[in-house]
């Protein structure tokens, strides 16, 4: 698992999400879809007012080349959280 803040270009050790029931359901659906079809690569969950967004991605050896270069470096770096 990698938790990445693209604005600061830093990995995070943990994150807390406070979700509405609708947002939680949307996140669960997106995660389920990606688990069943990793080739879809990533999904987005937005807050009700679209002021915040969570991007989730599933990576495998087979779909790693579909990520941008920065993401590939992050995902290949096994020594960091």
Predicted ranges, named:
Residues 1-81:
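Positively charged, low-complexity terminal tracts
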